[in-house]
Amino acid sequence: MSEQSKCPVTGRTAGNPVAGGSMLNRDWWPNQLHLDMLHQHSSLVNPMGDEFRYKEEFRKLDLGAVKKDLYALMTDSQEWWPADYGHYGGLFIRMAWHSAGTYRTSDGRGGGGRGNQRFAPLNSWPDNANLDKARRLLWPIKQKYGKMLSWADLMILAGNCALESMGFKTFGFGGGRVDIWEPEEDIYWGKEVEWLGNNRYSGERDLENPLAAVQMGLIYVNPEGPDGNPDPVAAGRDIRETFARMAMNDEETVALVAGGHTFGKCHGVGDPNLIGPEPEAAGIEEQGLGWKSGYGSGKGDETMTSGLEGAWTPDPIHWDMGYLGMLFKYEWELTKSPAGAWQWKPKDVAEEDLAPAAHDPSKRVPTMMTTADLAMRMDPVYGPISRRYYEHPDQFADAFARAWFKLTHRDMGPKSRYLGAEVPAEDLIWQDPVPAVDHELIGEGEIAELKKRLLASGLPIPELVSTTWASASTFRGSDKRGGANGSRIRLAPQKDWEVNQPEQLQRVLEKLEEIRHAFNGEQSGGKRVSLADLIVLGGCAAVEEAARRAGNDVTIPFAPGRTDASQAETDVESFAVLEPLADGFRNYARQKYSVTPEEMLVDRSQLLTLTATEMTVLLGGLRVLGANFRQSPHGVFTKRHETLTNDFFVNLLDMGTEWKPVSKEHDTFEGRDRKTGEPRWSATRVDLIFGSNARLRAIAEVYGSDDAQEKFVQDFVAAWNKVMNLDRFEIS
């Protein structure tokens, strides 16, 4: 082969791709622990730089001007992708819905809060076909407002403006979504290796957790019915399961489906085999666009998207009762679209109930319903709700407005994070409200005094530390839920979670409440301490005392201002999903799972927004502080208990210890003296992974060195303080 045909850098020939042509570590060792998810979205991939603050930029934005531009865009049909019915509303509603609709409650991941629809795999999901065009239509507006308006906010705002421009009154809009700049590596979308694959069910039809869609590449359900079977009642069961996993109840589900399908149409007029590859697989000349269709012009009335064909209502660009009216007015018979997809047509449809052709208003064409739509009538629960909405249009409009707002804001966390003039004043239970501070906050003198009282209370260091960790570590960076603010650890359901050791927790909380009551009663002015603040302060005092015992004087920064939520402000069912299935930091697992304990530790660390270094130093410190579930000895590699030493790392790395499994599942281990055979320590996989995994061992070696004690304490305190304040959005 000639030298000209070889890459001058790598030596690869033209037949081998320069990028991705060699085996990666994960190709050689597919079971390797996936730590990269802990280092996503760093400043190295963010073109905005470390000093950029989106909140400050958004506050400069003229939101009214942006909305005016969006309203104008709705009817500014472009030749390269003409608007159905002369209005892009339906397209932008679908784009916003599919941006937000990937959210799932089980781990809080997905949703529209990061603008992730711009990246793989979402930008190439079959269910997102042709939404690339919607984003390209928005580019002139994004270009105009630049850094003041994120893609994430723009996509949701475009959906709102689409609804408003077609006559619907929305509930409001909150900005503040910060864009990411690379695909998310932490989200498990399923194990299937083909689009629309379905290997996620077991039993009769038990959907794998944490998934919230029935097939790979769909947002929720197959609109043709379960696995393409056009059974509306069976479709209702799938809809209920998937929407519930997105935090929607039955009434919200009906409102969303009926409200959203009041607008726009489906596209399936020709042979689906003529649709080209998705954006990530398309040629470079397509410039990031995909699904180029070879059917006719590939646009306008010859557009191919889902394979279904037709509008739901006779007037697809105005808010009315057309969807529910058609649903109940007619009987429906099964048919197939021109593309071969199962759908339903109304029997003996009246002339006035035909829809205009999307690009020729002189023509009238039949409307349609999908199998999923008919579930809104045929399902025994959805049916009566749909009928009530049909008979009470005001209830329907209010329910849809609220459900749409919830859909598009559910992953943003508490209302305090919302920005802009259109944030609704009403507090909603799903926003996990906490009361505003209504008292003077404690200062440095009171903080020092309270620490003394906490340490003199008789509560041991392990109980103070584990209670504080239990309160703060519920936080999820995915949907900004959980955390210590609100002191919900004293409320149902958290007070009863096994991992929180309810009997010990009750004892600790009673003592903390006693201290709080006495302190507040002594104050002559309006100064008070909340239980939420005192819970965190107790753990901080315990960590500082443990560090002093190790010879290190440290003061953990403490910012008061947390308040105490009530049980009425706490949705028990909604908070139940925050219960840890496993918490490696406390060496806890509720049961054995198909994934390894160390994988669950990394997953939990990612939700806590920890780096691998922070995860490592926190776990090593919590072990010697005695924070294990039920005081388990596993991983407590120290003889100096309740002392913040680097002993965990020193003893983990000691080659004088030989480890062997003591359970057939290889999840618990015993470490014996390599020479004498005497037992030294016991451990779980979560403990030993820090000596086994090469990357984690490298970090452990830093903290296990002879000169590492001071650095270990400093790094532990920094990571601890980070977790304590993850939900303090007002100070972050």
Swiss-Prot record:
GO terms for molecular function: catalase activity; heme binding; metal ion binding. Its EC number is 1.11.1.21. Binds 1 heme b (iron(II)-protoporphyrin IX) group per dimer. PROSITE patterns: PEROXIDASE_1, PEROXIDASE_2, PEROXIDASE_4. The active site is at 98 (proton acceptor). Belongs to the peroxidase family. Peroxidase/catalase subfamily. It catalyses: H2O2 + AH2 = A + 2 H2O; 2 H2O2 = O2 + 2 H2O. There is a cross-link at residues 97-220 (Tryptophyl-tyrosyl-methioninium (Trp-Tyr) (with M-246)). The gene is katG. Its cofactor is heme b. The lineage of its organism: Bacteria, Pseudomonadati, Chlorobiota, Chlorobiia, Chlorobiales. InterPro entries: Catalase_peroxidase (IPR000763), Haem_peroxidase (IPR002016), Haem_peroxidase_sf (IPR010255), Peroxidases_AS (IPR019794), Peroxidases_heam-ligand_BS (IPR019793). Heme b binds at residue 261. One of its GO terms (cellular component) is cytosol. The record marks 94 as: Transition state stabilizer. This is Catalase-peroxidase. Formation of the three residue Trp-Tyr-Met cross-link is important for the catalase, but not the peroxidase activity of the enzyme. It comes from the Bacteria. Bifunctional enzyme with both catalase and broad-spectrum peroxidase activity. It is an enzyme of class 1 (oxidoreductase). There is a cross-link at residues 220-246 (Tryptophyl-tyrosyl-methioninium (Tyr-Met) (with W-97)). Signal peptide: none annotated. Homodimer or homotetramer. Gene3D superfamilies: 1.10.520.10, Peroxidase, domain 2. Keywords: Heme, Hydrogen peroxide, Iron, Metal-binding, Oxidoreductase, Peroxidase. It comes from Chlorobium phaeobacteroides (strain DSM 266 / SMG 266 / 2430). GO terms for biological process: cellular response to hydrogen peroxide; hydrogen peroxide catabolic process.
